[in-house]
Amino acid sequence: MPKMKSHSGTKKRFKVTGSGKVTARKAGKRHLNEHKSSRVTRRLTGETVLSKGEAAKVKKLLAGHPGR
């Protein structure tokens, strides 16, 4: 059986922490920001931790990636 390949798009978008949590950048700050307040755009900065169900799906896509 061949080696399992990890999903390249998922590798670029998500990160698994040492404790096993999955983090991702917050959505909604790429474009159409002119009408959003500074408070909203600041809140959308940084990373967020995925829920347990979403994290499980991401980990399945990263299964072939070493160290994940």
From Swiss-Prot:
Residue numbers spanned by region Disordered: 1-38
Stored Pfam families: Ribosomal_L35p
Gene3D superfamilies from the UniProt entry: 4.10.410.60
Coiled-coil region(s): none
GO cellular component: cytosolic large ribosomal subunit
Any one GO MF annotation of this record: structural constituent of ribosome
Signal sequence coordinates: none
InterPro entries: Ribosomal_bL35 (IPR001706), Ribosomal_bL35-like (IPR021137), Ribosomal_bL35_sf (IPR037229)
GO annotation, biological process: translation
Domain of life of the native organism: Bacteria
Alphabetical UniProt keywords: Ribonucleoprotein, Ribosomal protein
Biased amino acid composition, Basic residues: 1-15, 23-38
Family membership noted in the UniProt record: Belongs to the bacterial ribosomal protein bL35 family.
Matching NCBIfam families: rpmI_bact
Annotated protein name in UniProt: Large ribosomal subunit protein bL35
Native source organism of the sequence: Cutibacterium acnes (strain DSM 16379 / KPA171202) (Propionibacterium acnes)
Gene from which the chain derives: rpmI
